[in-house]
């Protein structure tokens, strides 16, 4: 093991990277409420892991979606646990995100020079809510169907572009297979990718600027 480590150390300077990560200064005013962002990240990672596991069994079609979810819950080994953890961590992620936003706002963490960190955080909040909207529809039960119908119908009130925008969201004039396909793609590919990118930007800026001081 020593030789393997030395081989990587010679090329990547692993020890220098580890020292930089572990030696970052933490202000004395930092308390448990400053961990809310990290808890949100942890929930996101749990979401990725459990969501990936369910993609092996979930079928994104209007005729098979509900049955595939029932199959996960009743037939797949620990499928009920995986889906339950996915749902619980989703709720926890939203809650932790809201508390994190309040903490940052109340402690002035959005002020100069951390404006861009705040902007990326707001974008991450929008992405988190979008996860909830798209994921809610995937079981394609009565609640999911009507939730999608209502949410995608909201833009119709916008003058001129309302109707075309609704059709883009649904994939057709009415809610159906195209809508489910769009929401599944958003939930499992587009939103996770965007979230990972903006989280990386968010953390790099925090790393560069450090934790904001007390008010």
Swiss-Prot record:
Main location: plastid
Cellular component GO terms held in the UniProt record: chloroplast thylakoid membrane; membrane
GO molecular function: electron transporter, transferring electrons within cytochrome b6/f complex of photosystem II activity; metal ion binding; oxidoreductase activity
Note accompanying the cofactor annotation: Binds 2 heme b groups non-covalently with two histidine residues as axial ligands. Binds one heme group covalently by a single cysteine link with no axial amino acid ligand. This heme was named heme ci.
Disulfide bridge partners, by residue number: none
CDD domains named among the record's database cross-references: Cytochrome_b_N
Binding residues annotated for heme b 2, in chain numbering: 86, 187
Keyword tRNA processing: no
GO BP terms, alphabetized: photosynthesis; respiratory electron transport chain
Cofactor(s) essential for the protein: heme b; heme c
Binding positions (heme c): 35
Localization (cell): Plastid, Chloroplast thylakoid membrane
Residues spanning the membrane: 32-52, 90-110, 116-136, 186-206
Miscellaneous comment: Heme 1 (or BH or b566) is high-potential and absorbs at about 566 nm, and heme 2 (or BL or b562) is low-potential and absorbs at about 562 nm.
Family to which the UniProt record says this protein belongs: Belongs to the cytochrome b family. PetB subfamily.
Protein name per UniProt: Cytochrome b6
Organism: Physcomitrium patens (Spreading-leaved earth moss)
